[in-house]
């Protein structure tokens, strides 16, 4: 409790220092000298009311009509002339811009001067993004309060490290390279193309060729995808959200999830130094679209996927300007979710070479890939799967068993009718209505406390 109170006090002290710097005060204790007092605020409010009243009477739609001849006396005509002269004098006055010395005008709520949890206003005042205050975002402390999940992650990491193939990498220009020469089908394909958007936002000249979405769409991903597989495509935060879906459809995948990378600025608070000319707001997140191919149900295909282990959010510190590398946590999410061992990373770099993955990219400085050696790791039956231990199976989140009508106290299943339950329309209807993996509840953990979305939407 004392440490928590101390942390709150330190944050309050930091905020006061930042406010003093922005308001031009000598120190945090002298902020009150530059802010409006209650009397000043009351005077400002009265002045506003007076201005509004005068504007209401002097507005163009509130102008009095010139009195008709014969219907008005001389006194009304004189009043009309005085009003016209007053309006002309006000129009000739120089415009004075009102200077706001504090944020009381923009406070959240109308009955209180306390901004409470108005993180958006706090960002305006201090430059700290709202996502800076989300707790337990790191891999080390995320499951600190959930011992079962922490143990599950530990066991899965051990199993993955034991079943990983040696890291392989291939330096190749993907624009000219025929990816069918890899001579393998992959369970997971991760694409990290160097989009023009990344360099357009930073204003830095690209040190590698930028790919357009037309170029990305020409990649023959469908030729190397296993019958049931997943693709993860980093698509930025602009036009790629729509064009990325087009790519997934072209490759034979259905979009089933959107993993968001939320960027914090705890170490360097302030406004974004660069802004995409096509953007209206400052963009502080990126998206990774996830596609599914084939039929995969989380309730029956536990040999291939383990759902609800991770969340669909990645929250890390924003990298330096010009650094377009993605957080390493995306690899953990993929490895925890899909039990397939044949993993391919396209547009990889030397820094992303990883056990259990085949990394292909134009910026790699070396190659050790051999198609026959790589295929030899998966010759035995089911050798393309990591497998699962009894302890992991016991700890991992599972889908609740489906409830039938008899379980709820009903009678025979619908469609039993003539010919018995097996011949009725109900059984065929249930078979027809069985959805694939995306139709069932979430692929990733929906997040505790309602912070995150709960999985794959239905079509």
UniProtKB/Swiss-Prot annotation:
Residues 425-443 have a biased composition (Basic and acidic residues). SUPFAM superfamilies: S-adenosyl-L-methionine-dependent methyltransferases. Keywords: Differentiation, Nucleus, RNA-binding, Spermatogenesis. One of its GO terms (molecular function) is mRNA binding. It holds the Pfam family MT-A70. Belongs to the MT-A70-like family. This is N(6)-adenosine-methyltransferase non-catalytic subunit METTL14. The gene is METTL14.
